[in-house]
Curated annotation (Swiss-Prot):
It comes from Scomber japonicus. This is Myoglobin. The lineage of its organism: Eukaryota, Metazoa, Chordata, Craniata, Vertebrata. It catalyses: Fe(III)-heme b-[protein] + nitric oxide + H2O = Fe(II)-heme b-[protein] + nitrite + 2 H(+); H2O2 + AH2 = A + 2 H2O. It is found in: Cytoplasm, Sarcoplasm. Keywords: Cytoplasm, Heme, Iron, Metal-binding, Muscle protein, Oxidoreductase, Oxygen transport, Transport. The gene is mb.
Length: 147
């Protein structure tokens, strides 16, 4: 519970502008890990220079952060949130589990810059995401997806 609270303490600036922060997260993900852009067919033709102002990237980034907010606010009681998410990411989107590790580090960096996430908060976010990723992976295995 302490890790969830430590991250939520810094969540206000993220929640205040999901579109902007979400765009920053995905743009940085695609910039630092260009192969990840291929996982999003609807973003395939968007050049790096055009991402910052792209409404579709902002909207999807906001969706990612809103789902993370649900997980954070559930404070560990997130099975009902993760199961459908794992199902769609395994069966429809085919997203390998390692990509969640990549986006975790991007979210840590963006929250450090835009929400003042301190060292303790960064560790807490990595811990929360570690549990989330392990639970996603367990669901993937149940579905027979070795992402």
């Amino acid at each position: 519970m302490a890790d969830f609270d430590a991250v939520l303490k810094f969540w206000g600036p993220v929640e205040a502008d999901y579109d902007k922060i979400g765009n920053m997260v995905l743009t940085r993900l695609f910039t630092e890990h260009p192969d990840t852009q291929k996982l999003f067919p609807k973003f395939a033709g968007i050049g790096l220079g055009d991402m910052a102002g792209n409404a579709a990237i902002s909207a999807h980034g906001a969706t990612v952060l809103k789902k993370l907010a649900e997980v954070l606010k559930a404070k560990g009681n997130h099975a009902g949130i993760i199961k459908p998410l794992a199902n769609s990411h395994a069966t429809k989107h085919k997203i390998a589990i390692n990509n969640f590790k990549l986006i975790t580090e991007i979210i840590v960096k963006v929250m450090q810059e835009k929400a003042g996430l301190d060292a303790g908060g960064q560790t807490a976010l990595r811990n929360v995401m570690g549990v989330f990723i392990a639970d996603m992976d367990a669901n993937y295995k149940e579905l027979g997806f070795s992402g």
